[in-house]
Amino acid sequence: MDELNRKTVEEFKQAEKNKIIVLLDNIRSAYNVGSIFRTADAFLIECIFICGYTPPPTHRSVHKTALGAVDTVDWMQFDTVEDAINQLRENDYAVYAIEQAEKSISLEQFQVPLNKKIAIVFGNEVVGVQDKVMQLANGCIEIPQHGMKHSLNVGVAAGIVLWKLVHP
């Protein structure tokens, strides 16, 4: 560790992680992906699943924005979101979409099911989480908003949700 009590990459890899997987589905911006990697590093997130046309950590802009978090946070790439969700289900993860929807649960009210591993799906910056993902998910979580836009940057939304999940 250095003077700021930061773990080395190896210490981070060995550290116990929060049983949360972040699934990024068709995120356009490499900068948003890099930001989410940094957030995942900050909160000891288990893994990030990259789906669809989401830029992978090997993309120059993701790597630059992530400030090294692509080396500490595990990640996997999937051609389709369905493939990713199938793998999550096979490994006993509950899948929750982050989206504004009729039957969504407020993030303030959401409680992680006891002894359950969870995956959180963040969708495209313009169209959000796909309908097919909403149908496959165990539920939908919504970030309460009080302004006029009811729209958050996906990187900001990831930070809010992940902070809440690791600080119930």
Model-inferred region functions:
Residues 1-168:
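Post-transcriptional modification and biogenesis factors for structured RNAs
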